[in-house]
Amino acid sequence: MSSIVNGFSIQKSTKTAYDTQQPCDCWDCSAFTAVVGCGQTDGMDDWEFGETACCFTCPNKKQCAKPDPAECNIGTDSHQRDPLTRVTWNGRGPNVQCVYDVNRINTLEQIDNFKQRFGVHGDYNAVVANYCQQSSDSCITDPETGTKMTKCSRFKSDQKDGELCRGWFNQQPKAVQDTVVQNYCAVNNTPDCKCVNRAQNEVYRELKIGKVINDGCWFTPCANPQSYLLTTEVENPTCPSNFCDIIYNIIKDRDVTIDDVKNDINCVFKPDPPPQPKPQPPPDPPKPPPDPPKPDPPPPPPPKPTPPPDPPKPKPDPVPPPKPTPPPPKPTPPPPIPPQPVPILPIPPVDLKKNWIMLTFVGLVLALVIYPKSRHAIGTHTWRNAAIAVLVGLNAFGLQSYVNNHV
């Protein structure tokens, strides 16, 4: 890729205007004064942006400007270097052409400034392509180690430069994508280039089986587009259903240890079962001991004389059976106790030594007061009835006193 990129725009600044040295003041010019044109830059006429009216009949003086480098400023790179190498006209002014060293455009700010000044046409694509083919220190996780890659392409960066480059990359034709990743990995053998640079991998060279099985089926870096850069030849491959069996047989045939290659193989192999121990032959049965020699039979003992039989012994007298013990006599129950007569409690007589007569008298007096007819009689004959009541009360009191004393 060429290291030169261009940006094209229309100059608006007149800060670079200069004097054409044409006389214009009175007494210095006349109608016959020659008109002086604008100068040139790189063989192209400078920008004539206007005229200045001169004295009386003198011809007007042209206003000219050189290309302004400020119209091309996109900022310095990460090493504080200005990428602008030359400013000239694009045919003629005010069409300006800015020439840059693309290798000094390596910051997001420069990319944004270039886009704002010149748009996404022209060499913007080349600027982004060169920027994205540079390496980054902010990387995604390497699935092989479980830690972040120490260095990677900007396509695998986890910062904003990664977002920019992935967006640009996905908009490119497949042929351009292949060229970009191959150019990057040819210069930078970073961990995300394990698929593109797989020919440098010892495990790949050990197990490569020609073109029978696509590398995107069995070689792990080529089967993981999220972590590694891929070319179109290994993307979305058609894989045979038994490709893991084929790889397993190749590993066995080439006497390769599975543990040494399992991280690079896109298959899950079960560990080999431990070797079965060889059966031990059964021990020889013990030999039976030899039969001992049979001893000579002992001589038979001489016959003994038969003793005479014992005389019969007299039989003992029979023992009489024991007499049964009579049962003990039953206890005599005590005679029954006759019931005792319960004395009849006498009903106590009514005690007449009370004020019964007086109470009766008081009750009669109250009855006379309570009943309406009695109140009427009392109200009509008050004094007479009061006298009668006093006499009756005295008689009742006397009768009660007699009863209490003599009865």
Curated annotation (Swiss-Prot):
Biased composition (Pro residues): 271-337
UniProt entry tagged with the keyword rRNA-binding: no
Transmembrane helix among keywords: yes
Primary localisation category: virion
Transmembrane segments: 355-372, 385-403
GO CC terms in record: membrane; virion membrane
Record's bilayer topology term: Multi-pass membrane protein
Alphabetical UniProt keywords: Membrane, Transmembrane, Transmembrane helix, Virion
Subcellular location as annotated: Virion membrane
Annotated stretches, region: Disordered: 265-337
UniProt superkingdom: Viruses
Similarity remark: Belongs to the IIV-6 337L family.
Name recorded for this polypeptide: Putative membrane protein 047R
Organism: Invertebrate iridescent virus 3 (IIV-3)
